[in-house]
Amino acid sequence: MRKDIHPNYQEVLFHDTNADVFFLTRSTVKTKTTREYEGSEYPYYPLDISSASHPFYTGEQRKTSTEGRVASFNKRFGAFGGRKKAADTDAAE
């Protein structure tokens, strides 16, 4: 068997910077910094988003960004949608 072909699987401290939550789990991620957590020194890896701050898991859906995207789409491509004729709108009423 060949030696040194597997990555180093170790305990790593992940930090969700948006929610300020720490997770201690095992990973093969390579880090340059370490941090003390609960009395022990661990490799430290900051995260922008995790299950603690992701809108799907927190239930805080952001509708404003979606509405803005739809409005932007309609503004750009609304003219291509084909306009209803006056006869069609009168018949609908």
Swiss-Prot record:
Single GO molecular function: structural constituent of ribosome
Keyword RNA-binding (UniProt): no
Record's keyword terms, sorted: Ribonucleoprotein, Ribosomal protein
Pfam families: Ribosomal_L31
Gene Ontology biological process terms in this record: translation
PROSITE patterns per record: RIBOSOMAL_L31
GO cellular component: ribonucleoprotein complex; ribosome
Coiled-coil residue windows: none
Family indicated by similarity: Belongs to the bacterial ribosomal protein bL31 family. Type B subfamily.
Oligomeric form and interacting partners: Part of the 50S ribosomal subunit.
Name of the protein: Large ribosomal subunit protein bL31B
Native organism: Psychrobacter arcticus (strain DSM 17307 / VKM B-2377 / 273-4)
Gene name as annotated: rpmE2
